[in-house]
Structure formats: C-alpha cells, structure tokens
Amino acid sequence: MRAPPPFHMHTALAQGLKALLRQLEERLALQSPLKVFLAGGMAVHLYTASRVTTDVDAEFGSRVFLPGDLVVDVRLEDGTRELLYFDTNYNATFALMHEDYLDDAIALDMGVPQIRLYVLLPLDLAVSKIARFADNDKEDIAELVRLGLTTANEIEQRATQAMAGYVGGLPMLRLNLRDAVALARQAEAERGAGGNSRA
C-alpha cells in the first residue's frame, strides 16, 4: 500500500478552498461535523499544485443546501484573480467511480472545525476522468502518473472493477479506458526518462 501523498496546502487555490469551507461552515451554522469529499480539478491541484480550477467538485456526507452565493476571490500566483465556488451541478454518479472511492478517500485537516474534508485518492481521481476524458482530464491523468501518485496498471485494474457498477455506454468507456491506460504508460515512460519524481 502506497504511503499517503503530500498535499500542497500553501498555494493560492488551497488557501481559497480553506476560505470557502469556512464560509460553508458559517452559512450552514454547523453544530456537528459535516463530511465533504473532494473530487475534480481542485483535488488534483492539492496533489500536484499544477492544476488551476475555479469550480469545486464536492460530495457531502449529509444532505445539504448549498447557498449559490458562496464565492471566494482568489489572487493566483501569477497575479490573476479568480472566483472560487462550489459546482452545485456536480454529481459523482456521472463519473466512473469504484465502489470504495469514498471509503478510501484521504482525510485532510483544513483547520475548519466542523468540516471533515476527505480527498479522493489519486487513483480514484484518475479513474473518475475516464468517462468524460476531455483534454483537461487527460492532462490530469498524465500529471498524477508523472508524479508517481498512481500507475497505469492500477488505473486499469480499478477502472475495470468500477465498470461493474457503471450505467451507460460501456463500449465507449472501454475505448476511453484503453486510451487512458496508454496515456498513463506514456507518462510512466516520461517519468522513468527523468521527468518529475515524487517528493
């Protein structure tokens, strides 16, 4: 079992996420801890520090009403300003997800007392990118592999297991998986040839 990877907590986006979670805690007037499972580009950013995203994909352990005006103004490292917000349309059922993805998520203390944040494993983030497989999804998979956070074999095995519970176009999904594994193997080759290495 791979050791938990380090998180990049000092980037502008990571600090913006912390502020957004504080807003959520205050607006919901939480009296007991709320589990929040982080997916998507923001989760990738916490692992890689290279992905820039403004919408936060999150799944909640309880039914919550997300105020539509929860927004944090973030000044990125290059000086540009972005608005960070929860994607209220995010739905994990549209992605390819292994049945254990929530149980295997990694706890991350953001210093917000009533928010229990869990970040999806790099492996599950990579698998979740396969159904859509847009350009940014491909980049995310490659970067996670280049950093040694997951492997082509792990992605292939986890995604194949996840397909058992997937409802949708399996032929296209299998094609996407084939391409994702090929992409991951290419990223492994780049890593082996002297690319990025894990801290």
Q: What name fits each language-model region?
A:
Residues 1-199:
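Compositionally biased terminal segments of proteins
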